Amino acid sequence: MVGVVVYGFSTEGYQIASTLASQGFPVSMVDEEMQIATEITPAIAKAIRALPDLIGRDQLLSIKPVEAALNEAEYIFFAPRVRRHPEEAGSEVNSKLREVAKNMMKGATVIYHLPSGLGGFETIVTLLEKVSGLSSKEGFEYVYAPLKPRTIEPYCLGFLSKPKKNLFNLFSKLGFKPAGLGCRSAEALHALKILGTYSTLAPQIEGYKFLESSERVKLGRLLGGRDVFIDTLSSQMLDLRLVAASLPPKEPLVHLASNILKIVEGFTKRVLEEVRALMKSLELKASKTKVILNWSVDRYEMRGDRLGIHQSLREKLRDYVSDISTTSSAPWSESNLEFKLKEILAEPSVKLIISGSQSDHEALWDRLSKEGLLGEYIFIKANLVFETMSTKTARFGGGYV
């Protein structure tokens, strides 16, 4: 049975590790921060569904040095967490790639799950060759397989050379279905998908600025703006930045990508402006208003953009309204919804609740509705149209403010 290493203590990495382990593959998962490799057995994969549940169980797990795990791996799935500032993300990833290259055995296949931008595979392969001393033609294989956020579904599969049958068999166990392309074509496909997604959303972000609240909601029903929240908008910022940075200078597409990036990056500021405008229109004083940021973020997912934007929004809100807390409904979150609700309701001030996703909004709304909790709430959906609803006492019919 072939040896597998998943390099990266990430949500996506654990999904890959547990999926393969449950099918009998010997799998080790590298925690790049703790510098240990943990064996993921079928029993662990069955018992532990989410990565946070694996933490703190060191006594029950088989651990080995990272070097030993990489030396034995025929397949290395590269799925680390990227947490540094966007300008430093490249050096962060490269340092982790060097560790892989330094210890991988001859004949290994490296499957790269982060986005790389256009031409990124050439830089990555060159680094792997230089550090490992192996040739990409004979010494190792490289596959580009950027994953969609929080999933193990790749946007595409890009190969340096004709893939072996064993590799396709392994990919089939993970449910990888995209047709195989060359690395350059795969990077172009991924870049076009990212640009296509954000080029549709960016005009809406700007266009809704010129409309009143009720008009925005009506138009949002037609264009789908009500369905896109800050959670989705921030989920692939790393991809967008890498694509924009890798485009040839002076090309028209560079200006398009740069402007889209500027618009999307400004959405956090837009949320803050909408909160200020709403409080002003309702004559709410900052000193008597409690703000709840109800947004589930996964601190273990590979891309760190959602986490960073959540933190930035929370800090900017705190600069304006000092009484602010956070809550979450996600299973991976360390925030307990029931406890947070009791904490929120203990305050007599008006509660302004900003939801970062539809699932967060529905979870909190349903809980408040079922409990019949008394109080006055103003809900803001942090979607493209900034849908706003209010409810008083136990009535949850809601209506636009």
Regions inferred by a protein language model and the residue ranges of each:
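Rossmann-fold dinucleotide-binding core
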Residues: Y14, A79-P80, K96-R98, K102-A186
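Rossmann-like NAD(P)-binding element
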Residues: D53-Y112, W332-G375, F379
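Structural motif
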Residues: G8-T11, D31-E33, A79-R81, H113-S116, ...
